[in-house]
Amino acid sequence: MNHIKDQIRCGAAYRLGLTGKGIGVAVLDTGIFLHRDFDSRVTGFADMVNGKNFAYDDCGHGTHICGIIGGSGRMSGGRYSGIAPGCDLVMVKVLDRKGNGYSSDVLAGISWILERKEKLGIRILNISVGACSKRGMSENSALVKGVNRAWDAGLVVVVAAGNNGPRTMSITTPGISRKVITVGCSDDDREVLVGGNRMVDYSGRGPTAACICKPDLVAPGCSVVSCSSRADKYTIKSGTSMSTPIVSGAVALLLERFPDCLLYTSPSPRDMRRS
């Protein structure tokens, strides 16, 4: 994680003392293991898959995502700390132990978050989840309407572009929404999977069926080390799923520095990118 933070120049934010403190980041994923890197900052959990009332992750994907966003790095001496190590984390489990799920559970998760966003201080919604069925590729799909509703309610919604590249029109739903920040995967100058400094081949590409340019941003996502769901260890994963929480963490730092910057306007993804 340290080389990724260098790549995206987190040092400037850290020199200002920014850690994402006080910013709630909600995550729709496979759940969360209470790794010691999260300290006591997991402030909410809901399970739309199995209905359990305690935090768990039977896949590992969600825990890895949360570590990238806000792990403290406590168990690695700070080496694998997340982008916003002081932020609060809210997990809604919408995917099963194999990483599969239903759009109805994702929509239920979005509704759960919107009902509690004030109470839990949620400002950001991270969705490293996508559907690639042709029926879901319309801007009128339920998933797109769901993330648009979250954006209109004041959340910064950050969504993975998916791993169906390099062909065009391969952005997964709900990343095709013109409102949300859709994130692709770059190789961050390291010779992993592909060489050179460019979007990796598997990263989803636009335009969308509605001719919207996507992704809005790319971020490092190759061989990212983050929290494991097995004990207090770490593991390596790659994909746009890993790039997306890097952007979510960066937004948390931005909102800590400028907490009112989104209260009176509805910025486009382009506005957030410029910030």
Describe the residue ranges of each PLM region:
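Substrate-binding/access-modulating region of protease and related hydrolase catalytic domains
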Residues: 94-179, 209-212, 230-238, 242-243
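Short amphipathic alpha-helical face segments that pack within enzyme cores
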Residues: 64-68, 108, 245-253
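Structural detector of well-ordered beta-strand residues that form the stable sheet scaffold
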Residues: 90, 156-158, 182-183, 225
